[in-house]
């Protein structure tokens, strides 16, 4: 099986449990004889492509969208302050990852994938875009909900 795997947190950029899970599950998927292409965030200091432990990793180089992003997002997002840069980077990572997966790997290189796996809301944009443009089956993994992250208080 050939799997497209989208997770904003992956080796070597780990923030918490999501990245640890992603590393362990992709390692096991590979051990079972499957091929896996991981799409993850690039902090600007990493290779845009590498094979690590037999796992293909794509890290698109981000562009700065902060001059335009506040103009095109809703008011509630503009109130995020410096967190808006994080969201802009996440959104850009998703668009670039989906574009590379659909246009380069599938359309140009004619690679065959069996399923798309995308993890948490941080990679949901790319997973949904890839699903809509390829009609591949997709699995969306939710790793926690806001109530769990904020000890029941929400972000409001």
Region locations from a protein language model:
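N-terminal subdomain of nucleotide-sugar transferases
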Residues: 1-61
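Active-site proximal beta-strand in glycosyltransferases
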Residues: 3, 115-117, 130-150
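Short, solvent-exposed loop/turn segments at secondary-structure boundaries
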Residues: 14-18, 130, 151-154
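A conserved catalytic-core segment of Leloir-type glycosyltransferases
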Residues: 37-110
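Short acidic, glycine/proline-rich loop/turn micro-motifs
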Residues: 70-71, 149-155
């Amino acid at each position: 099986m050939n799997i497209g795997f989208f997770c904003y947190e992956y080796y070597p950029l780990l923030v918490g449990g999501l990245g640890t899970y992603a590393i362990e599950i992709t390692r096991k998927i590979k051990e079972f004889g499957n091929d896996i292409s991981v799409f993850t965030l690039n902090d600007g200091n990493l290779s845009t492509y590498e094979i690590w432990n037999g796992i293909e990793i794509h890290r698109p180089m981000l562009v700065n969208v902060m001059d335009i992003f506040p103009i095109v997002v809703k008011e509630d997002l503009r109130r995020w302050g410096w967190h808006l840069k994080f969201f802009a980077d996440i959104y850009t990572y998703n668009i670039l990852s989906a574009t590379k997966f659909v246009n380069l790997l599938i359309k140009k290189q004619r690679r065959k994938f069996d399923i798309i796996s995308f993890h948490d809301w941080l990679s949901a944009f790319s997973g949904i875009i890839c699903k809509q443009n390829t009609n591949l089956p997709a699995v969306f993994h939710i790793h926690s909900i806001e109530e769990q992250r904020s000890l029941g208080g929400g972000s409001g």
